[in-house]
């Protein structure tokens, strides 16, 4: 049933682009994408060194929704290596969440989300690490990642988690499995940008239900 014209619609998409003037919330669940191929509507980049990352859709038995997930499958062990997959539209104030499952990685098992992204070297990032048992919040400026807030707590490998953030103005809140774990402020990036997902070094991570809501 159609909503009145003044109400912004909510959409659930495989990986398609969407009209920002009509949609307030969207979820990418990757179920309309072809397994073994990159998801439609996404761009890919690399912060740091090493291989750029290989992002493909996979069908898995335990996907949080549907059957498909997005996976970064290249286990290059370069330490300062951050593959990212991102999409639009550009948003400034938003809530961003993702379901993520750390699958493998001897050096890292980092599952992250990025927002207010200008390019592969400039964005906000929060990530949960199953090898370190923590959640950190950073800004990355000209390729240099700087942590300014964090939380220590159990991040289990091999199970699905939800990582989420909300940012309005310079106020940032980060949530892990429904619990607020970080509440801070930062003025590094003040304009709208794209959003997406992130990994580190040899992390093999599955992602599903990437959801962005304009605030």
Describe the function of each predicted region:
Residues 20-48, 208:
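Extracellular carbohydrate-recognition regions
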Residues 22-25, 189-215:
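Ligand-recognition surfaces built from glycine- and aromatic
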Residues 30, 96-98, 159-174:
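Short tryptophan-centered beta-strand motifs in secreted/extracellular beta-sheet-rich domains
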């Amino acid at each position: 049933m159609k909503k009145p014209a003044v109400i912004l619609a909510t959409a659930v998409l495989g990986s398609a682009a969407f009209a920002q003037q009509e949609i307030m919330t969207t979820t990418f669940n990757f179920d309309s994408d072809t397994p073994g191929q990159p998801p439609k509507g996404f761009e890919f980049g690399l912060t740091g060194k090493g291989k750029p990352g290989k992002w493909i859709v996979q069908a898995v038995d335990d996907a949080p929704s549907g059957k498909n997930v997005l996976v970064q499958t290249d286990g290059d062990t370069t330490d300062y290596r951050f593959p990212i997959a991102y999409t639009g539209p550009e948003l400034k104030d938003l809530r961003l969440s993702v379901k993520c499952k750390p699958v493998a990685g001897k050096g890292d098992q980092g599952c992250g989300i990025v927002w207010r992204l200008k390019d592969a070297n400039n964005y906000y990032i929060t990530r949960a690490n199953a090898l370190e048992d923590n959640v950190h919040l950073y800004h990355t400026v000209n390729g240099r990642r700087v942590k300014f807030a964090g939380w220590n707590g159990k991040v289990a490998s091999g199970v699905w988690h939800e990582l989420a953030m909300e940012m309005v103005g310079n106020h940032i809140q980060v949530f892990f499995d429904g619990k607020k774990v970080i509440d801070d402020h930062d003025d590094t990036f003040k304009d709208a940008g794209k959003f997406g997902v992130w990994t580190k070094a040899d992390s093999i991570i599955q992602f599903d239900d990437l959801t962005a809501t304009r605030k």
